[in-house]
């Protein structure tokens, strides 16, 4: 019988679906394992082989944990609101719902064709009113807690898309060729800053890649500093700045405020007012990225006003520059050009003084010195001196002096800003708020608030969403009076902030999630997805989860205990797969040519899961040959009879088998799938070489291979007489004695160069290893006439002799 991947893969996918083989159990006595993918946005372009890498990895872990006796939750759904479907609707008039349904069907078919063991009874879609009812419910809870508010804010406006972008989205859209400008707009904002400290601190509680944790730490941007008041000459008020370096106050030679600072125009003297207004208008056309780039040329305008340095009484000129942002600190900074590169460049351009206050190894007039490791100089007045002090001591002494004078106070600041949450588009969750004629706002009482049908999907010219044109939906009246519904919708991130909870209890119409089910399943044991979501989805979902924790809806402080970021699979040209490059490898093409098992194995065999690696079609052909070898362990293709015997394997084969069990188990736990597959390849070759077709070894191999190649292993498992699915088979346990080699090959080096090898029994002493090494013929000649200076023995691995010529 020949291996026909097409027929048997369809057979088993159909059977798994009919029997609901992978439905999670209601048995809460079993240990649970919740393994989750970052669920996909169902785009019109379908899935390519790169998309499948993470899904394959989670499926391997789901199947592996089932065999280990865990109750596994492994669901799939669709993050289906979003701009692409709406843009398509604007071009074609096709309702986004229809486009989304079509794309979801395509994605679902591909994922099922891969044999992924999802519990499809839990499938969710963020555009389903039964789902976004609870997204709206969470929003109202945020509103009730004062964490959702309306503000007139300067937003990142994309004219082509007619939509507001979150700060975290700007870089991507600019890279895609869109124009992004700043403009004021009425927006719903979520107060994520209220959770900044918890979002930072609780990163220590999760098993995440350190680079992702660091990206979140940097984005939150906690800093300890001071707010210092500078008295404004001629204005009877103070200008408050935020600084992390009060120890450098004596070196401040000018102040800078942002163009949006409320005092920007007020500080402009008559002669400077025109220039100041012009500069402020120009700044509005720039994105924050353009304004704050380290390589950008510094621009600015002098207001004509001066402020008094509280440390030395000097009058410092007040400038306006777009590299200062109102959203961070106070929107005003003190500039110490000798010890800050940005301030130094600005001072050089505009001829401002540069004063050394940190002892520098070079002339600060020629080059900035921004190190903290030196001590203070030129920093004293009649009341305080911090000369000779290190950073921490000087910081504390200066802070205490400023506080005693009422000129400053210690302050913890964050770069993190509140989340601009609303979008001016149609295809998103309606925000369930009603605005009344008396100026009050009230929540919708009947959820879900669904989207009306519209004839045109373009945002209005005023920046409102198309919902503003649907008067029958927009206006209403209730016991509180006449109202106008909110026309902004939620961003795509909303539905993905909490979807992991809905998978636990997807049909519940009375609650977001049943408390007993939440307590059993949470938190997510393994979450796999791309690192590009580090400061977007992963931060937003942590924020919402903490709010739900405070509300008593969830029992854990963090949603995802372990996070793993898969590396990207590149095209065969070593470039990122994209239509424009023409290097996309469609998943369906590979599936029809090689089958799901070959594709799954190849993607995991390409290299370490977390590394970037290129696709190579020739490589998958080698995997196909391996699967045929596995097939031939059971079937004789010439006679179409089974080869399986009830014979006991030899001692050597048993040892090889238990070494494989140990290696595959340990590597799978660590998601080192490429080396686990390599170990199974070695075992299969050894079995064929020894002519060993024992049921014991074959069945063990099939169970080890089943998470990686489920279709062929199901078929062969059935052929060996098993009525139940291999997914319920017990994972083999290795015998430590059999998994250890009795005889080891020891390398011998002389002065670090390999000169020979010898075999030694496992457990031999260092002394025995050294004596045996000296007797190796190819080694002895390099020791002859030499003085052995040092002998090094690494048990079970190598012996190294350090030698020099005898005197």
Swiss-Prot record:
Gene3D superfamilies reported for this sequence: 3.10.20.590, HUPs, Isoleucyl-tRNA Synthetase, Domain 1
MF annotations from Gene Ontology: aminoacyl-tRNA deacylase activity; ATP binding; leucine-tRNA ligase activity
Broad class of the protein's primary localization: cytoplasm
CDD domains in the record: Anticodon_Ia_Leu_BEm, LeuRS_core
Motif 'KMSKS' region, chain ranges: 576-580
Residues annotated as binding ATP: 579
Catalytic activity reported: tRNA(Leu) + L-leucine + ATP = L-leucyl-tRNA(Leu) + AMP + diphosphate
GO biological process: leucyl-tRNA aminoacylation
EC number(s) from the headed UniProt entry: 6.1.1.4
A Pfam family annotated for this UniProt entry: tRNA-synt_1_2
Keyword flag Nucleotide-binding: yes
Similarity section: Belongs to the class-I aminoacyl-tRNA synthetase family.
HAMAP family: Leu_tRNA_synth_B
NCBIfam families: leuS_bact
Protein name: Leucine--tRNA ligase
């Amino acid at each position: 019988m020949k291996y026909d991947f097409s027929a048997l893969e369809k057979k088993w996918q159909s059977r798994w679906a009919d029997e609901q083989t992978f439905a999670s159990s209601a048995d809460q006595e079993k240990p649970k394992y919740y393994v989750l993918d970052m669920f996909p946005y169902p785009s019109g372009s379908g899935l390519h082989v790169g998309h499948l890498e993470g899904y394959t990895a989670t499926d391997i872990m789901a199947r592996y944990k089932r065999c280990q006796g865990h109750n596994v939750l492994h669901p799939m759904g669709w993050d289906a609101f979003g701009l692409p479907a709406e843009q398509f609707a604007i071009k074609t008039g096709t309702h986004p719902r229809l486009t989304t349904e079509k794309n979801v069907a395509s994605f679902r078919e591909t994922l099922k064709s891969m044999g992924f063991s999802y519990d499809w009874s839990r499938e969710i879609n963020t555009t389903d009113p039964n789902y976004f009812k609870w997204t709206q419910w969470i929003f109202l809870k945020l509103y009730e807690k004062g964490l959702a508010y309306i503000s007139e804010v300067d937003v990142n406006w994309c004219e082509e898309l007619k939509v507001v972008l979150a700060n975290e989205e700007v870089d991507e859209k600019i890279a895609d060729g869109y124009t992004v400008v700043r403009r004021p707009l009425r927006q719903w904002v979520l107060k994520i800053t209220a959770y900044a400290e918890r979002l930072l601190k609780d990163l220590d509680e999760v098993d995440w890649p350190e680079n992702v944790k660091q990206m979140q730490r940097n984005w939150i941007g906690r800093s300890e500093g001071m707010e210092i008041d500078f008295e404004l000459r001629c204005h009877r008020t103070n200008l408050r700045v935020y600084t992390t370096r009060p120890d450098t106050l004596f070196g401040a030679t000018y102040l800078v405020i942002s163009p949006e600072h409320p005092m920007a125009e007020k500080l402009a003297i008559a002669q400077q007012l025109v220039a100041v207004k012009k500069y402020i208008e120009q700044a509005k056309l720039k994105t924050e990225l353009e304004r704050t780039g380290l390589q950008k040329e510094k621009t600015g305008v002098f207001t004509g006003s001066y402020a008094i340095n509280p440390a030395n009484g000097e009058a410092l000129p007040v400038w306006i520059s777009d590299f200062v942002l109102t959203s961070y600190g106070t929107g005003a900074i003190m500039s110490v050009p000798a010890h800050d590169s940005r301030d130094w460049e600005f001072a050089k351009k505009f001829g401002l003084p540069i004063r050394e206050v940190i002892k520098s190894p070079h002339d600060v007039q020629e080059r900035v010195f921004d190190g903290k490791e030196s001590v203070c100089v030129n920093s004293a007045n009649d009341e305080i001196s911090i000369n000779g002090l290190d950073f921490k001591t000087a910081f504390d002494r200066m802070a205490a002096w400023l506080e005693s004078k009422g000129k400053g106070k210690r302050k913890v600041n964050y770069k993190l800003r509140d989340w601009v949450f609303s979008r001016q588009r149609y295809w998103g969750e309606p925000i369930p708020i009603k605005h009344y004629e008396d100026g009050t706002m009230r929540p919708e009482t009947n959820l879900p608030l669904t989207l009306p049908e519209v004839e045109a999907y373009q945002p209005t010219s005023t920046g409102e969403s198309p919902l503003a044109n649907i008067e029958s939906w927009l206006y209403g009246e209730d016991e509180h009076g006449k109202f106008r519904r909110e026309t902004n919708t939620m961003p795509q991130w909303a539905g993905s902030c909490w979807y992991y909870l809905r998978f636990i209890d997807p049909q519940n119409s009375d609650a977001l999630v049943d408390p007993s089910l939440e307590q059993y399943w949470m938190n997510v044991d393994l979450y796999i997805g791309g690192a590009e979501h580090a400061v977007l989805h992963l931060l937003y979902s942590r924020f919402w989860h903490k709010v739900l924790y405070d509300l008593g809806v969830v029992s854990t402080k963090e949603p995802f205990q372990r996070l793993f970021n898969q590396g990207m699979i590149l095209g065969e040209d070593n470039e990122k797969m994209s239509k424009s490059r023409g290097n996309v490898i469609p998943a369906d093409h590979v599936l029809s040519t090689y089958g799901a098992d070959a594709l799954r194995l190849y993607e995991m065999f390409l290299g370490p899961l977390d590394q970037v690696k290129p696709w190579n079609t020739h490589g998958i052909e080698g995997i196909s040959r391996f699967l045929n070898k596995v097939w031939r362990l059971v079937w004789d293709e010439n006679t179409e009879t089974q080869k399986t015997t009830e014979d006991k394997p030899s001692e050597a084969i048993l040892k090889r088998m238990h070494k494989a069990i140990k290696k595959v188990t340990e590597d799978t736990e660590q998601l080192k799938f490429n080396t686990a597959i390599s170990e199974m390849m070695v075992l299969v070759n050894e079995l064929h070489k020894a002519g060993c077709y024992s049921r014991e070894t074959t069945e063990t191999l099939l169970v080890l291979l089943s998470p990686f190649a489920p279709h062929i292993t199901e078929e062969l498992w059935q052929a060996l007489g098993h009525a139940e699915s291999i997914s319920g088979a017990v994972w083999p346990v290795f015998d430590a004695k059999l998994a250890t080699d009795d005889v080891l090959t020891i390398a011998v080096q002389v002065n670090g160069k390999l000169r020979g090898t010898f075999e030694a029994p496992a457990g031999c002493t260092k002394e025995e290893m050294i004596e045996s090494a000296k007797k190796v013929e190819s080694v002895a000649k390099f020791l002859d006439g030499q003085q052995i200076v040092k002998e090094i023995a690494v048990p079970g691995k190598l012996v190294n002799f350090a030698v020099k010529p005898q005197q």
